[in-house]
Curated annotation (Swiss-Prot):
NCBIfam families referenced in this protein's UniProt entry, alphabetically: eubact_ribD, ribD_Cterm
Catalytic activity: 2,5-diamino-6-hydroxy-4-(5-phosphoribosylamino)-pyrimidine + H2O + H(+) = 5-amino-6-(5-phospho-D-ribosylamino)uracil + NH4(+); 5-amino-6-(5-phospho-D-ribitylamino)uracil + NADP(+) = 5-amino-6-(5-phospho-D-ribosylamino)uracil + NADPH + H(+)
Annotated Zn(2+) binding sites: 62, 87, 96
CDD domains hit by this protein: Riboflavin_deaminase-reductase (cd01284)
EC number: 3.5.4.26, 1.1.1.193
Record protein name field: Riboflavin biosynthesis protein RibD
Residue span of region Deaminase: 1-157
Disulphide linkage map: none
The species this protein was found in: Actinobacillus pleuropneumoniae (Haemophilus pleuropneumoniae)
Active site: 64 (proton donor)
Entry keyword annotation includes NADP: yes
Region of interest (Reductase), residue spans: 158-376
Function: Converts 2,5-diamino-6-(ribosylamino)-4(3h)-pyrimidinone 5'-phosphate into 5-amino-6-(ribosylamino)-2,4(1h,3h)-pyrimidinedione 5'-phosphate.
């Protein structure tokens, strides 16, 4: 859509600046577009921005359409900067490539290629065949960073998994007595609420439910609420816990291997979906669970489990990203739990290998953002 812009305010902007503006616009859709990608679009004519837009929500207009259709300017001869290759197929909305051609756009800068099999280079090729000059790969790394969830889901049909945990400077997620509220400060906890808004689902193990009785909702104002998932192999989740009692308000799923129909039927009238999965060592097979969640169009999963579930997730090879919050506190104690439990590994060369993407100071706490490059 068109936003009021000061006269001549962007006269000295470069191609890189325009694409950075498109990236900033795309980020405004965080949490609302899943399972669609984040996309921003800026249209420039005679050195000035005349239209801009972003994909605001699932089912809504795409970025290019938002920019073009809310603008009354003649766009003939203009240049478009789009963070993701324009679509060329009919989905919930008509093709964006057709619209850019119809409005006389003469040049299009594209940040990321779209791996969606329905697009996958066809959008750029259609523009070229219509005589539009296409430049691909402008700020590709930054544009790619907008959509790790979309890229993963569209190619695997499984959720992108982010493991999140908070620990003290000596690597403890709780004291020896089990107390964990609160390890991090308010600012870090507020960031977690934003992350919950951005992910389609959040998962904990039944031990976390029994110990903390969590709600697992996003407390950010006007947030989109994630699907709440409990990994509970033997259906030990109490019927009177907060997750079950609020299941009609917030979608709640229990993943289990139990075939106890009497137990299963106790949850259904309360609004809980019980998902029976394959068993692996008498526990939920997390690979099978991810397959089922993908079929439910859940494109992303925030894992806020305890040490046992965290290790199981790593052992199953489902984790794509890790957010490690470190608080400036020391608690010690041999019995105090660490973020990753389970049996662990026996040899260092078998360790899960991570790549550090960023380090951020949030209040007094540190957030380390890693991607998994070598799973177990």
């Amino acid at each position: 859509m068109c936003f009021p812009l000061p006269s001549n305010s962007f006269k000295t902007m470069t191609d890189l600046d325009y694409m950075r503006r498109a990236i900033a616009l795309a980020k405004q859709g965080l949490g609302w577009t899943n399972p669609n990608p984040l996309v921003g679009c800026v249209i420039v004519k005679n050195g000035e921005i005349v239209a801009e837009g972003y994909h605001e929500k699932i089912g809504g207009w795409h970025a290019e359409r938002n920019a073009v259709l809310h603008c009354k300017e003649d766009l003939s001869g203009a240049t478009a900067y789009v963070t993701l290759e324009p679509c060329c197929h009919h989905g919930r909305t008509p093709p964006c490539s057709d619209l850019l051609i119809e409005r006389g756009i003469k040049k299009v800068f594209i940040g990321s290629s779209d791996p969606n099999p329905l697009v996958a280079g066809r959008g750029a090729n259609q523009l070229r065949q219509a005589g539009v000059e296409v430049v691909e790969g402008l700020l590709k790394e930054e544009c790619d960073a907008l959509n790790p969830i979309f890229f993963h889901y569209i190619q695997t049909k499984r959720p992108y998994v982010l493991m999140k945990y908070a620990m003290t400077a000596d690597g403890k997620i709780a004291t020896g007595s089990g107390e964990s509220k609160w390890i991090t400060g308010e600012s870090a906890r507020a960031r977690v609420q934003q992350t919950r808004h951005q992910y389609s689902a959040i998962m904990v193990g039944v031990d976390t439910v029994l110990a903390d009785n969590p709600m697992l909702n996003s407390r950010m104002p006007n947030a989109k609420q994630p699907v709440r998932i409990v990994c509970d192999s033997q259906l030990r989740t109490p019927l009177d816990c907060q997750l079950v009692q609020t299941a009609k308000e917030y979608r709640t799923v229990i993943a289990t291997v139990s075939d106890d129909l009497q137990k299963i039927e106790q949850f259904r009238p309360l609004g809980v979906d019980v998902l029976v999965c394959k068993a692996r060592n008498k526990r939920v097979d997390l690979q099978d669970l991810l397959q089922k969640l993908g079929e439910m169009q859940i494109d992303s999963l925030l894992l806020e489990g305890g040490s046992s579930l965290n290790f199981s997730a790593l052992e199953s090879g489902i984790v794509n990203r890790v957010h490690c919050y470190i608080a400036p506190k020391l608690v010690g104690g041999k019995q105090a739990k660490t973020p990753i439990g389970g049996e662990g590994i026996q040899q260092i060369d078998q360790a899960v290998k991570l790549k550090l993407k960023s380090t951020e100071l949030i209040g007094e706490d540190i957030l380390l953002d890693y991607v998994v490059i070598s799973p177990l």
